[in-house]
Amino acid sequence: MELVYLVTPLLTWLVVGPIKFLINSARQRRWAFNLVGNGGFPSNHSAVVTSMATLIALRAGMGHPAFGVAVTLAFIVMIDANSLRQHVGRQAAAINRLAGDDPAHKRLRERMGHTLVEIAGGICTGIAMGFLINALFK
């Protein structure tokens, strides 16, 4: 196996994380350490799976079965990011409201999941990373 297939998701994650932090910090006009994690622009998960699908397309071709698997996985990840995790965030908000000011309750994170724009940003970033990594590891 070529090492590039293991390096791609790691490099993509390491590049997209700081980009997301800087974008969120600029939006908040302060260092946004509280926004590190799930959610935000661009979507790390979408970028990682898209970078792998892009790399597979560039190296093995879009007709290769691995590309089909990568695209399927990407759709599952993106659907999860957009719908399921947003529902989890709404449930967390409801639980936080019910708990009120109970000191025994540790507030749950309410910002979960991604908007379609955040997912699209992850897709664009992932495609760019796939092309960049392919060029660097030829």
Predicted regions and their residues:
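N-terminal signal-anchor/start-transfer transmembrane helix
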Residues: 8-24
